[in-house]
Amino acid sequence: MKRLLDFTAEIEKKRNTDFLFLVPCCKEIEKYYEKLGYENFFKIRKIKFIGKNFKKPICKSPCTGTYFSNDFKCPVEKICDMVYNDTNYVKYCQKDINYAAKLYSKFFGGKIVTAGQNFAICFYCKNNILKIIYFCAGNFGDSKLLLNSIYKEFPSCLEYNFDVCAENEFFKSYSNSEFYGMIKPLNSHAEKAVLNIKKSKKFPYLGLPLD
């Protein structure tokens, strides 16, 4: 593993890449990565709603669920810039989102649920449990609107498990934030950037999962 990661770092340095980042599968692996120069850097909130206790937010706007497809035209880059304009986050292009769309649609019955200028990537992980891996909604009202749309699209799940941005105000009362993902700066400029963000304690949102 060390040789592979060292080789990857050398290749990316030649490409002028600033960072490498990854998600460890367990605490033991996390400690191993720390020895190789990686450090915890990204944060999320993990929220679980039990189906029967999932309270449907009240809103009048209709749900517009969009199945994953190659022609998904939602302007995700602009939406993410708008939602996370005051938040550090990893920016994905339309191609990245479309790839995730096809992956979760083909293998997990996935769907992108939209509500106004907001969207969420949802899929079934097991036993009628819904996983929401990318909840892209900014303010309190937009989050309620998107939650309502998700509930309308998937009204009878046993559990609803969310991975959301740690800075999302709507979810702050539901759970504490936790680290999800590690980073390794590859040059002095990147090291300074990581240090400044750590000092601000505004840890970035990784968005699409890497595991």
Identify the meaning behind each predicted range.
Residues L5, E10-C26, F154-C165:
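Conserved GNAT acetyl-CoA-binding A-motif
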Residues E12, I79-T87, I150-F154:
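Hydrophobic, Leu/Ile/Phe/Ala-enriched alpha-helical segments that form helix-helix packing faces
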Residues E34-I58, Y124-N127, I133-F140, N148-D211:
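Active-site/acyl-donor-binding loops of N-acyltransferases
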Residues M1-K14, K35, F140-K152:
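Conserved acetyl-CoA-binding loop-helix of GNAT-fold acetyltransferases
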Residues L36-I132:
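Amide-forming acyltransferase catalytic core, primarily the GNAT-like/NAT-type
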Residues I29:
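Helix-turn-helix
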Residues M1, T8, L22-P24, Y33, ...:
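Long, contiguous hydrophobic alpha-helical segments, chiefly transmembrane helices and signal peptides
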Residues C26, F72-V76, S143-K144:
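A structural signal for well-ordered alpha-helical scaffolds and beta->alpha junctions
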